[in-house]
Amino acid sequence: MSFENKSRHLHLWELAGLIALCAVMLSGLWAEGRQTSIAGSLVRLHVLAVSDAPEEQAVKLRVRDAVLECLTPRLADVHDADKAGAVLTSSLDLIRTAAEGAAGGRAVRVSLGEERYPTRDYAGFTLPAGRYRSLRVVLGEGQGHNWWCVVFPPLCLAAAEKEAMQPVMNFEDYALITREEGWEIRFRIVELWGELINSLEL
């Protein structure tokens, strides 16, 4: 191969690499925007047990039930995530009291902030990895297996349906998380991007 042909060959590879890099960056920006949009419609609940001992895992579930019982009437007439966040912020002491009542003397910490979540499958929909507003309930040192769900809209209960997402989400976000026909590849892009960012921030 002549020098001229080699040079042309290298330029083609460089161009292909540049195009691929641009495609990845654009996909990443789109994926980050979609995850941020999805997260902006929700509030997650994260309960961490003292340890993995069966007794502590049972306590974790009792605390979960007490927190949900406390929150259900307070969020019943709430229709957007920002309002839900405001209600939760003003109810942190009540939530802590409810959790302590079920914790059997264990230390309880309750906070509302942002947390990174992995990709998580629920009944009929999947939430991609990324940052979400999160009500965090920690028992003791929180070294045990955790439990998480979506507290707004109220999807923590067994009878909850994915359709509860529709009033609080735009069409594109809802189509993504429910993986409607034709949206599977786009969801996978969002999922992979979120998992990549999660791993970089560990």
Predicted regions and their residues:
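Sec-exported extracytoplasmic/periplasmic mature domains
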Residues: R64, L68-A76, D93-E100, G104, ...
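Soluble extracytoplasmic domains of inner/organellar membrane proteins
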Residues: F125-W183
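N-terminal Lys/Arg-rich, disordered targeting/topogenic segments
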Residues: M1-H9
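Mid-length scaffold segments of soluble, non-membrane domains
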Residues: D82-V150
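Short flanking/linker segments adjacent to small metal-binding domains or redox-active Cys/His motifs
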Residues: W183-L202
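Short extracytoplasmic
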Residues: G40, R44-H79
